């Protein structure tokens, strides 16, 4: 009697090809990595965070400042040494080298392929060429199991939502437009579909990112799109309103990043005042003195920004403002720097970061006369941060005694030993945290990714200390 084999028996059990993956750089690069990983997984590739045992490695790079370039080149070198088969993508991939060459190719000529940022299809083409995708007659018939939201590299309870790519500004210290191009806004229907999918998947905090969130829709002249059968204008105000509406049934947060201080931002403040989205704005001001801002080719001026911030606080007294600044920009005088320190005290910026100016290859700021010695740039950065910490400390002290909603990020032993979380004033990774003490009630537990109420009892540096209630 002959043996009859089932179809499953006849199919090869050859393991799926494995791709090692490293993601470097900012949240915008992270979302590019998520798109690539989602596509790899949808096509049947296995992925890992290590080079060992991988059939090839993809390195998503950063090329904005010298330290980031070095880290990216070093990582590519490590991947080549440990694995030998490397595909490079990201901002460094778009960076030119000597002559008309490519920097990555010049430094690491043995890489398999090099692409710029936001190039999922080009990366997949390179993967297919060097590691043909697996064929499974059963899996090939299954739709993408990851849905619209795809694979996320963040913790499950928060996610980045990129609304556009590129930038129309030509700031003299920045080379992003040369790597990521001019502004290209995503269709508003696609953005809102992804947001809803993320909330449905359990995300409790959505962080809206881009190179210039305020300019969303400028490139398409605020074209009217459609979502859920309704017309929606491709513009920041309508986007934020819709995101708040989608988040509300889930009790989730929406946080805005990379918001240029245009007058149109004023229209969004009432949505913050009414709780539609978090009263938090990440606004990259960079400096306050009009002459420095002119050399930077930045919009607005310190005085206009002071007026705008005051107006924002009138509309929404609870607003928290985060910003980044550059100390020691070429030609910056002591008087111009003193102007920046005074601006910080007057504006009362809640959260501030500062970089000592560093020349970026390809930036037009390199041609501005008056490059300051490194020790002067670093000394000014330290002085700026001392003032920023002074302002931040006063702001944090004002919260002692208040009860705040906190999103739990860590909770060992269900929080019985305490944990950490963040209030609406704290974006992940760049701001402080709320250090949660053990709950007073034995029955009280904490769970990562859930909200809890906590009474603020003190401060520690940039952080708050609280007891869950």
From Swiss-Prot:
GO terms for molecular function: 4 iron, 4 sulfur cluster binding; aspartic acid methylthiotransferase activity; metal ion binding; protein methylthiotransferase activity. Its cofactor is [4Fe-4S] cluster. Its EC number is 2.8.4.4. It is an enzyme of class 2 (transferase). It comes from Polaromonas sp. (strain JS666 / ATCC BAA-500). Residues 17-132 form the MTTase N-terminal domain. The keyword Lyase does not apply. Disulfide bonds: none annotated. It comes from the Bacteria. [4Fe-4S] cluster 1 binds at residues 26, 62, 91. [4Fe-4S] cluster 2 binds at residues 167, 171, 174. This is Ribosomal protein uS12 methylthiotransferase RimO. NCBIfam families: 30S ribosomal protein S12 methylthiotransferase RimO, MiaB/RimO family radical SAM methylthiotransferase. Belongs to the methylthiotransferase family. RimO subfamily. The keyword Oxidoreductase does not apply. Catalyzes the methylthiolation of an aspartic acid residue of ribosomal protein uS12. It is found in: Cytoplasm. Residues 153-395 form the Radical SAM core domain. Residues 397-469 form the TRAM domain. One of its GO terms (cellular component) is cytosol. InterPro entries: Elp3/MiaA/NifB-like_rSAM, Methylthiotransferase, Methylthiotransferase_CS, Methylthiotransferase_N, Methylthiotransferase_N_sf, NA-bd_OB-fold, Ribosomal_uS12_MeSTrfase_RimO, rSAM. It catalyses: L-aspartate(89)-[ribosomal protein uS12]-hydrogen + (sulfur carrier)-SH + AH2 + 2 S-adenosyl-L-methionine = 3-methylsulfanyl-L-aspartate(89)-[ribosomal protein uS12]-hydrogen + (sulfur carrier)-H + 5'-deoxyadenosine + L-methionine + A + S-adenosyl-L-homocysteine + 2 H(+). Binds 2 [4Fe-4S] clusters. One cluster is coordinated with 3 cysteines and an exchangeable S-adenosyl-L-methionine. Its main location: cytoplasm.
């Amino acid at each position: 009697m002959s043996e009859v084999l089932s179809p499953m028996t006849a199919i090869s059990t050859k393991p799926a090809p494995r791709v090692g993956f490293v993601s470097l750089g900012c949240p915008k690069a992270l979302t590019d990595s998520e798109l690539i990983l989602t596509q790899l997984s949808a096509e049947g590739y296995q992925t890992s965070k290590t080079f060992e045992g991988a059939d090839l490695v993809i390195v998503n790079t950063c090329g904005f400042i010298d330290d980031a370039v070095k880290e990216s080149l070093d990582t590519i070198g490590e991947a080549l040494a440990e694995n030998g088969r490397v595909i490079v993508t990201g901002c460094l991939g778009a960076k030119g080298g000597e002559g008309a060459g490519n920097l990555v190719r010049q430094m690491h000529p043995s890489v398999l392929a090099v692409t710029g940022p936001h190039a999922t299809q080009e990366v997949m083409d390179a993967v297919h060429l060097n590691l043909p995708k697996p064929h499974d007659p059963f899996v090939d018939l299954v739709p993408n199991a990851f849905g619209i939201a795809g694979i996320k590299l963040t913790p499950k309870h928060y996610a980045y939502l990129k609304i556009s790519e590129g930038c129309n500004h030509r700031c003299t210290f920045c080379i992003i437009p040369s790597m990521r191009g001019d502004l290209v806004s995503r269709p508003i229907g696609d953005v809102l579909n992804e947001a809803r999918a993320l909330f449905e998947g359990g995300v409790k905090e959505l962080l809206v990112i881009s190179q210039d969130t305020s300019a969303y829709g400028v490139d398409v002249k605020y074209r009217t799109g459609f979502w859920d059968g309704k017309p929606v204008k491709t513009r920041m105000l309508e986007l934020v309103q819709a995101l708040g509406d989608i988040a509300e049934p889930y009790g989730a947060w929406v946080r805005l990043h990379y918001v240029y201080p245009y007058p149109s931002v004023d229209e969004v403040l009432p949505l913050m005042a009414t709780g539609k989205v978090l009263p938090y704005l990440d606004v990259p001001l960079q400096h306050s003195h009009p002459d420095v801002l002119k050399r930077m080719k930045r919009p607005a001026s310190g005085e206009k920004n002071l007026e705008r911030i005051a107006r924002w606080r009138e509309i929404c007294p609870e607003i928290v403002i985060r910003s980044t600044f550059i100390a020691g920009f070429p030609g910056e005088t002591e008087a111009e720097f003193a102007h920046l320190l005074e601006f910080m005290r007057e504006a009362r910026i809640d959260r501030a970061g500062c970089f000592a100016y560093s020349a970026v290859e390809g930036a037009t700021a390199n041609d501005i006369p008056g490059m300051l010695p490194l020790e002067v740039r670093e000394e000014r950065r330290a002085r700026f941060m001392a003032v920023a910490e002074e302002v931040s400390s006063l702001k944090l002290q004002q919260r002692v005694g208040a009860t705040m909603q906190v999103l739990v990020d860590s909770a060992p032993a269900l929080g019985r030993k305490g944990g950490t979380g963040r209030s609406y004033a704290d974006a992940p990774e760049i701001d402080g945290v709320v250090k949660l003490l053990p709950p007073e009630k034995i029955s009280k537990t904490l769970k990562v990714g859930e909200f809890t109420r906590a009474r603020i009892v003190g401060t520690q540096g940039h952080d708050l200390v609280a007891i869950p209630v």
